[in-house]
Amino acid sequence: DPVVLDSIYRWDDKKVGYLLYNQFNVLSCEKLISVCKRFKNEGVSELILDLRYNLGGNSVVQQLLASMLAPEENVARNDVYLKRVHNKDYEEELRQKGESSEQLLQSRMELAINGEKFDYDLSDANIGITKLYALVSGKTASASEALLIGLRPYLDIEIIGETTRGKFCGGYNLSAADWYLNMVDTYREEGRDFYAEHPDLADWKTHVADWGMYVINYYFTDKTGVRPDFSKGLSPDFKVTDAPFEAYPLGDEREVLLHAALTRAGKTDLPSRSVESRSMNENYRLIKYPTFNSNARESGTP
């Protein structure tokens, strides 16, 4: 289950949600919607979204989550959230088919999961947050980066952690059957016989039935067309190094990235960050970790 943790931290009159999400998986949609409904009903005003281990996944699921985080008025207008940029030939093919390369914020979404269609009503799952704290690392990539890039024009986002991976592109899986059967159909439309012309490929299933390729065919931009630098990832507003071998579990207020986010959100009664931790070796040694300085911005960031 990629929806690993969901919590609400309360202090004074403030409620801040925390969601640890590890993959944009179509099977996680119902759980995501349920969590967002809970946050909405509990009156969460800000969200800490932990994407430090999220390498990406399905772009439609990313669109679904964005539609529950973006301001409700933008979702109601179906505003553009992301743009996909393909090569000119594919863009022309999309134009001729009347299809769009834009992803929109939506209050209702349809997805196909294992051949079964699902219709999700998100109208009562939009949390209504005013600020998003994104916890990231070098493992944060692809759909995770797209989510933050697409939401930036709509939402106050503070990125905490380390520079993300920098995979600002997407594509699709092409199986051997997809390729061969498409070629067979193409030949047939031209009045030709694929297997007669290529008898050596007649038994392709014997050799490559389980093969496939992941084909990159677009990069993404925000609604204004701003394109990320492919040579770099997203730089954090507040640089904090993850410490996965600390004694504190994910979700604990003393865990380094969550501690930083809660500090930035204004929580003042946090426990001390001075900890002792086990190393990876069974013959462990004690490691002293310094206290996080919540006011230290990374040099060169706004």
Regions from the language model: what does each represent?
Residues 16-19, 23-48, 55-302:
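C-terminal "post-core" interaction segments
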